[in-house]
Regions:
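Mixed-charge (Asp/Glu-Lys/Arg
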Residues: 1-182
Length: 182
């Protein structure tokens, strides 16, 4: 722009997820996760989404908070290893069943072919729901105990997702517990 010197493209550091988190931050996040249970249900749901966005930010995953598209809401998204994950987050009184899993799968199928999903349910998933949901989907699942164990043991979120994705690719099972892969 004016002059003989060519314009240099802006330099951007390559995206890198954190492989470790300060143990003090993990403890604070773990305690905040526990404190969410004291909130009223609707307030707790929004607070849980905000908590997850902060967790993704701390882990260097370039999160996006919840957003609306025509006819649907996505609870958030993040990037990991050049993959975009769409988030479904629920904090309910009972484990998640097949209808919620299929509903989220439908959202993923309406996006780009390379889209992936992560369904984080504080209350877990029913065995019947997981069996009926089937195998070979582009969704992995986490429950509240997974989050607690990850934070309590100071395991980076990226490592948890990577191992869950690998296990899902190898077995077809969308849900494997953190304690079974670490």
């Amino acid at each position: 722009l004016g002059g003989n010197k060519p314009v240099e493209p802006a330099k951007r550091e390559p995206f890198q997820a954190r492989t470790s988190i300060d143990p003090r931050i993990s403890v604070l996040l773990r305690d905040r996760l526990i404190d969410l249970s004291n909130l009223q249900p609707q307030q707790r749901g929004f607070a849980f989404e905000k908590f997850l966005t902060e967790l993704f930010e701390i882990n260097g995953l370039m999160p996006r908070a919840s957003f609306r598209l025509v006819g649907e809401q996505i609870d958030g998204s993040f990037e990991l290893s050049s993959e975009t994950y769409l988030l479904e987050a629920k904090w309910t009184n009972t484990p998640i069943g097949v209808s919620d899993l299929h509903s989220f799968q439908g959202k993923i199928e309406q996006k780009a072919a390379w889209s992936r999903g992560i369904f984080i349910s504080e209350s877990g998933f029913s065995e019947e729901g997981l069996k009926a949901f089937g195998r070979g989907k582009k969704i992995i699942c986490m429950d509240g105990l997974d989050l607690y164990e990850m934070l309590d043991r100071n395991i980076a979120f990226a490592d948890v997702v990577s191992r869950k994705v690998r296990r899902a690719a190898e077995s077809g099972n969308p849900f494997v517990r953190v304690r079974d892969i670490f």
